[in-house]
Amino acid sequence: ECLALYEELEILLYQTTSYTSLAVSVDYTDTEAQKKDAKMTALAAEIGSRLSFIESEIADAPEELIRAAMDKTGRAKHYLAEILREKPHRLSAETEKVLAALRPVFNAPYDIYHMTKLADMKFGSFTVNGKEYPLGYSLFEDEYEYEADTDVRRAAFRAFSDKLREYENTTAATYNTYLTQQRIMAKQRGFADMFEADLFTDHVTREMYDRQIDLITEKLAPAMRKYARLVGKMNKLDRVTFADLKLPLDAEFDPRVTIGESREYVRSALSVLGQDYADMVDEAYDKRWIDFARNVGKETGGFCSSPYGCNSYILLSWNNRMADVFTIAHELGHAGHFRLCNGAQSLFDTNVSGYLIEAPSTMNELLLAQDLL
């Protein structure tokens, strides 16, 4: 009964914190949204601190008692198994309570980085051959990196990099703070190092991690170097710089895509996953799960948030490019995954390893590519 009530409260917290944090992601310059999110974050930390005794008391119970409870319970079985797995690395109940209260402080490096990047940086414009071009994070990443005009593309890269360089010390100090925090917590919890702690959280062994890095270095790197040379050849570049790597291989074919056309492409590609999945694609467009607008202060790239008990919310900056269509297919992979996951399992079973979480979304990109071919 305790865990059932605890899950209900955690679901409510998940939904409310998602509501306030997503409002900030849409526009980091919205001070009212920031205030609401800060209040909700503080409240969630206070509640988490007050309720931290639940996991501490479970972890302090004899292992045989926890395993007996796992055999009798349904929705909480994996939750109890995870507490048992983490038991050797838990600290005292009082320490865990304090750490839960300090969660907003632990999140500070992430928050500072995003506020610097999305609220404080003012890119202005740059000029090429007497013409002035506006510049921004999304404009650079989603537009100028694909620009066919080499002078404009490379000038945009220089202007963008120059602005980032103005904040390099702040960014470095923020990242160093995060690493210091992670190193200290890893040591306090009895891990050999930060790597072991992070991989433990993701249910991944060091051997798996090293194998992936080695595979990328040994197998992917040569192919990517060959690809870079091919980009230079097909686009008739004097040399290939970092500013040129997003150019299409076919310089003569870079079609613009409307939002309506993106729906047709994505639905066609993903219909192979069944009618329910195709219906979800339609629902995402019809019920406005997707925030397409490109505005100042908006989170860059694309992401999908799937609060338990709610539909998913997808954020991206639409630029009428085929790359955006792939982003939607990718993020709908997360939406489909968590629709099934959340619908069939306890909230406590939805914290998925990063090694698994990107599989459905990457598969959707492959399905889209296959369908286009």
Question: What label would you give each PLM region?
Answer:
Residues 1-252, 263:
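A well-structured
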Residues 252-257, 290-310:
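Catalytic zinc-binding patch centered on the HExxH motif and its immediate surroundings
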Residues 253-261, 272, 307-329:
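Short pre-active-site segment immediately N-terminal to the catalytic Zn-binding motif
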Residues 313-317, 344-354:
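Short beta-alpha connecting loops at secondary-structure transitions
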Residues 328, 332-336, 360:
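Active-site His/Glu-centered metal-binding helix of metallohydrolases
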Residues 352-373:
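Post-HExxH zinc-binding segment in Zn-dependent metallohydrolases
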